[in-house]
Amino acid sequence: MEHKPTHTSGQCPVMHGGATSSNSSNVAWWPKALNLDILHQHDRKSNPMGADFSYREELKKLDVEALKRDLKTLMTDSQDWWPADWGHYGGLMIRMAWHSAGSYRVGDGRGGADTGNQRFAPLNSWPDNANLDKARRLLWPIKQKYGNKISWADLMILAGNMAYESMGLKTFGFAFGREDIWHPEKDIYWGAEQEWLAPSGAENSRYSGERDLENPLAAVMMGLIYVNPEGVDGNPDPLKTAKDMRVTFARMGMNDEETVALTAGGHTVGKAHGNGNAANLGADPESADLEEQGLGWNNHKSRGIGRDTVTSGIEGAWTTNPTQWDNGFFHLLFSYDWWLQKSPAGAWQWEPVNIKEEDKPVDVEDPTIRHNPIMTDADMALKLDPEYRKISERFHKDPAYFSETFARAWFKLTHRDMGPKARYFGPDVPAETLIWQDPVPTGRKDYDVDAVKAKIIASGLSIGEMVSTAWDSARTFRNSDKRGGANGARIRLAPQKDWLGNEPEKLAKVLNVLEAIASEFNISVADTIVLAGNVGVEQAAKAAGIAITVPFAAGRGDATIEQTDVESFDVLEPIADGFRNWQKQHYAVNPEELLLDRAQLLGLSAPEMTVLIGGLRVLGTNHGGTKHGVFTDNVGALSNDFFVNLTDMRYTWKPTGRNSYDIVERNSGNVKWTATRVDLVFGSNSILRAYAEVYAQDDNKEKFVKDFVAAWTKVMNADRFDI
């Protein structure tokens, strides 16, 4: 028999691509299969720090003042490999911080500066983030020096703060507490376009109708942080750009005044770079060759640094003194007429007509040379849009008000995704509490929990009512920006009390009972709601023959309507909740994908999601009391019946509508139960079925209850950063 060699000289003896690229992955073979990867992120396997590492404990060792001094020294320590404009890195560091925080969007709370994700794809290679890799490399000696005591996420934002302070701005404050991730996020949807900077008419565009931007996106193009500086789709028209700005900044959580302040304040210092040919730039960091060592956009064909740098393609500074915080932006904007010109790199920009020589900024390398300042289309929108102009004129006339408004808006921009003040750390945390931080008063902890539980048991509320109300209160939590959750009991306030997903009539009835109990014991309604849910779970476990105590952490407070920005809470309204087998309407996205998104925002793993579904189904918590997925004859008992019957081959499953199925007995043909896609995916998807089979086993009835209680408690305490 002829034997073939295992490999021949010159051939690689490993399997090409299968383990190291996505070309042969399961997703590539079965693109429509439910991808659970978003629930399997940022675990210990990808984290180089040990399980006992605590960033908060490391922060306690940080010499904050020494770090701030080092950062301010860095600003004027120009390096030959990437020289500082006018000898000051402030503009570069501010852009890095701005773009780290500016990817945040309120729609789903994803993006932002809280994780240091600018270090990874796709953000590290976005066109709008060109040359920010240089800023991070300039910071590396400081990160190396302070090590574990400062995260990249904190350092990038603090560098922006110190840049502003070194140029004369009094900042509003700074909070440490952002923790680094160690690989790119898999859960953030950046858009469906397949090319960078695709115009709005391109295939898979994020726009529909007149110019309706797809939710939850905020940026106008794939690869931009906010709007196109040259104009809508690269066509200058400040009034059209103003419309884009309103949508984009609103989706970042900013109003008109904050939008004007951030735009003008961001352009008060630094410059744009476009003095050269963009075609000379090399690949972005993710695509660059090994010898580039993670640096991108390197120019090996011409000088490409200093005055010859190309980044956005726009060329010039906005103000006369680009390394000094002042009111020069508005002075130039209102002092001159502006006309469209092309930069040396071919980008559209606005330049002043007949500007005085002394109003021109000097060259970044030679102070004897002066250049025209520039404005982007977004800058011109601040002058030409009527509402933006009113705000701009006030800032122009009152520089102190502009500085204060910008400082507050900058703090909001850079801290919005950190969540409540309980997560803030450090000596520069502002004493003032701001409404966008969703403040919650501290609640009582010293009370007789067992006495309250006894009162709840005697209240006449059903297991389903108690459990579903607690779930609805807690499910608003978003691990993305740490908003929502049971603390504060905002489920009793507008807008949450009126959300369709919360069944307002039933909710009002339950709250009426629980608020009376809370008042009797002088405790928070928030604690009482969660405690009632725990009581329901304990009673259900007892009905299934298992005695268990659900852990409870007292101390939640009750927020007031004055502490609640009603409009900002609208974005937390659920459009679907697979855990309660409900969705507001049919969507292009399948129900099981919406379930996955909610589970990820709640911080759940796939096994936790699975056990919660199985438990909530048998507890009678379905929205509107529907029977879909209630695969049990003993509703109210915390049994594993959902999994037992889902995996039972005595049944077949027949579709009856877009999102409805009959569970039919094979022998008789009788309909036994009904279900939705969310129910049946736990028997269809191979991974979820593997989990379902674990909980369907005869020897895992107690494990099912224990795991359900653990996952339930995790959700109830998801927003308890104080414990």
From Swiss-Prot:
PROSITE patterns: PEROXIDASE_2, PEROXIDASE_4
Bilayer-crossing regions: none
Domain of life: Bacteria
Site feature (Transition state stabilizer) residues: 95
GO cellular component, one term: cytosol
Listed GO MF terms: catalase activity; heme binding; metal ion binding
Catalytic activity: H2O2 + AH2 = A + 2 H2O; 2 H2O2 = O2 + 2 H2O
Chain sites annotated for binding heme b: 267
Residues forming the catalytic site: 99
A Pfam family matched in the record: peroxidase
Covalent cross-link site, Tryptophyl-tyrosyl-methioninium (Trp-Tyr) (with M-252): 98-226
Cofactor remark from the record: Binds 1 heme b (iron(II)-protoporphyrin IX) group per dimer.
Top enzyme class: oxidoreductase
Protease in keyword set: no
Homology family: Belongs to the peroxidase family. Peroxidase/catalase subfamily.
Protein name: Catalase-peroxidase
Organism whose genome encodes this protein: Vibrio vulnificus (strain CMCP6)
Gene coding for it: katG
